[in-house]
Amino acid sequence: MTDTWDQETDVVVLGTGAAGLTAALVARSEGASVAVYEKAPTVGGTTAVSGGIVWIPAHNRAAGGELTVADALKYLEAQSLGVMDRELVETFVRTGPTMLDYVEAHSALQFEVAEGFPDYKPELPGGQPGGGRSLNAKPFDQAAVGEWASRITSFPIDFSNVGIDAETRARIHAAVDDMDGDYCVAGTALIAGLLKGLLDLGVTPVTEARAVELIGSASGITGVRITLGGKDIRVKANKAVILGTGGFEWDQRLVEAYLRGPLRGPVSPPNNTGDGLRMAMAHGADLANMGEAWWVPVIQIPGDTLGGKPRSRSVRLERTRPRSIIVNRAGKRFLNEAGEYNSMSGPFHQLDPRAGYVNDPAWIVFDAQHLKQYGFLGIEPGGVAPDWFNESATLADLEAKTGIDADGLAATLTAWNDAVAQEIDPEFGRGASAYDGYWGDNSAPTPALQTLGPLDTPPYYAVPVGIGAMGTKGGPRTDRDGRVLHVSGEPIPGLFAAGNAMAGVTGRAYGGAGGTLGPAMVFGYRAGLAAASR
């Protein structure tokens, strides 16, 4: 039977995060006709609610020293635990600078080096303790995208969700207020800059359009079926379909089937339900890295929901600043609280054959001085503690409210306070890494005291914390140009993927700030080039 089509274009891009918009921008700039479809009513996906930082480890824009490919590869290999595709990682590292130049030349998006932001494991071989590998999207005047400014994804979000304290918040507002225009920052700026480039090329994303089926045969993918306005339409793709649909962290069945441990909750928009993954699997796509996610510790405030489900907030300042620790039900610490967030999944997922997950549940425990000096998750310094803080004058009372063993916690606090007096953490090395103090107390007299401080001022507080995710990291396996590979090992003709819709190329590794968006844009760029050239 001859296929009938409602629409036709060269390249269909599904999703409008950094990966999808980059792919669409490149494909259109290279001469292909492009149609972009977005499941949500707004554009930007997870990128729009992120920090808008990209990690490009061998770019040529850093001040004070050259960033080399060799150092970047050495660094990623040192933290990969052997789960890394060397060819794809090298492709990412080598292509990054070219992608930056191309995107800046073909869109309104511009980048600047995030000076001083260290790599996440800077002491490893090839690491950068002084930073330089992460780049920010520059502030962007939203007036340039007209009515689309109000159609970029946003959360009912406050700065506590992204780990920005009152001082930094004030600096951001002051800088933006000094600009002449309606400027946005972070992930919103990244999306707006890419979107402006696409709009200038005559490509307008179609929203509330959910892709439900890839159309094709053994000879390749020829189009996609999309639900739009209550009916199905069939869109022919003369060259390719590019999946930029995000991960599967909001689909409980897929989470339970694939992730290597419990997921407390995602911090991404709730549209990431594995649509691209399912469509690719239906055509025999090989899968990789399915047990992994971009992990992050999260707190859920009672009664706070998103899409009818508990809303998760990432915690960074709260666990890094002095006078707070994380303990399990036995009252024992089990990790470096100030360490980079992705690696915390290992301790949270520690499984005892007899006791189950010994570090889940867990709590952030802090004292009155911490709350007075730093605040906590949107509560300003010196603010009133809400009921869900589990305020207790004694450790025995804290045990009654939370179940944390009082004797175990007392022993932990004694050992902790003794160690802090010597400015060391002999158990987990908190304060030893250049990264540990980055989100700490910058007014502290020594680097160690940016994150180390005693817990000795009642009342005490205990807030439940678990491991969440910014997105999943597994999906269809691809080649160096983003072509989705069949289980046979051969590319599926006409099908590409990028971002969290593809298997993460760095395996378990998370290089630094922007370690998600850097690869997403690089492989979106390469997929766009390859798709347009078919």
Features from the language model and the residues they span:
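Beta1/beta-strand and adjacent pyrophosphate-binding region of the FAD-binding site
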Residues: 5-17, 35
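C-terminal structured subdomain/cap of oxidoreductase catalytic cores
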Residues: 6, 25-26, 35, 233-240, ...
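Glycine-rich FAD pyrophosphate-binding loop
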Residues: 29-48
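Glycine-rich active-site loop/strand segments that organize a redox cofactor
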Residues: 56-92, 153
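Conserved redox-cofactor binding core of oxidoreductases
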Residues: 93-229, 300, 420-448
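An anion/pyrophosphate-binding glycine-rich loop and adjacent beta-alpha core
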Residues: 122, 126-130, 139-166, 277-279, ...
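Glycine-rich loop(s) and the adjacent beta-strand/alpha-helix scaffold that form part
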Residues: 181-188, 229-304, 351, 517, ...
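A glycine-rich dinucleotide-binding beta-alpha-beta segment and adjacent secondary-structure elements
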Residues: 213, 217-220, 408-505, 509
